[in-house]
Amino acid sequence: MGHANIWYSHPRKYGQGSRSCRACSNRHGLIRKYGLNICRQCFREYANDIGFKKLD
């Protein structure tokens, strides 16, 4: 049983390890509200494309 078989063999059905950004696959700073599932860095990049408007 080599390293490749053991690495990431634990089931990830819930928790922080089960979710990732849909744009960059990052697991930190996820925005899950409204089903976005996008990290905060990508949200800043794609906010206008998604339809979020910045109010002054």
Swiss-Prot record:
It is found in: Cytoplasm, Cytosol; Cytoplasm; Rough endoplasmic reticulum. One of its GO terms (molecular function) is structural constituent of ribosome. GO terms for cellular component: cytosolic small ribosomal subunit; ribosome; rough endoplasmic reticulum. One of its GO terms (biological process) is cytoplasmic translation. Its cofactor is Zn(2+). Component of the 40S small ribosomal subunit. Belongs to the universal ribosomal protein uS14 family. This is Small ribosomal subunit protein uS14. The gene is RpS29.
